[in-house]
């Protein structure tokens, strides 16, 4: 099975752009808003800020692993 190069590059670009949205600086709450919200909101904000972006990378990695035999044969 031959996979077009543009499709392969598109899948990689979409996967990487999805994982980069987790690192968006606008997603982090401001310190002033967190201080006004209380200790529970501060703990949640810290947990969200420290969360690793593993979820968007898992489909990309699994796709790449499944495409390796097709890439090597083609």
From Swiss-Prot:
Annotated localization: Secreted
Molecular function terms from GO: sodium channel regulator activity; toxin activity
Organismal lineage: Eukaryota, Metazoa, Ecdysozoa, Arthropoda, Hexapoda
Cysteines paired by S-S bonds: none
Signal sequence region: 1-23
Residue list for modification Serine amide: 73
Family membership: Belongs to the formicidae venom clade 1 family.
Tissue and organ expression note: Expressed by the venom gland.
Role summary: Vertebrate-selective toxin that causes pain by targeting voltage-gated sodium channels.
Entry's Gene Ontology cellular component terms: extracellular region
Record field: transmembrane: none
Residue ranges of the propeptide: 24-53
Protein name (Swiss-Prot/TrEMBL): Myrmicitoxin(1)-Pr3a
Annotated keywords: Amidation, Ion channel impairing toxin, Neurotoxin, Secreted, Signal, Toxin, Voltage-gated sodium channel impairing toxin
């Amino acid at each position: 099975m031959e996979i077009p190069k543009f499709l392969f590059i598109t899948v990689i670009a979409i996967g990487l752009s999805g994982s980069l949205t987790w690192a968006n600086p606008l997603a982090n709450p401001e310190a002033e808003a967190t201080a006004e919200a209380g200790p529970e909101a501060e703990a949640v904000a810290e947990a969200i800020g420290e969360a690793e972006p593993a979820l968007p990378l898992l489909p990309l990695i699994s796709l790449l692993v499944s495409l390796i035999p097709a890439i090597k044969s083609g």
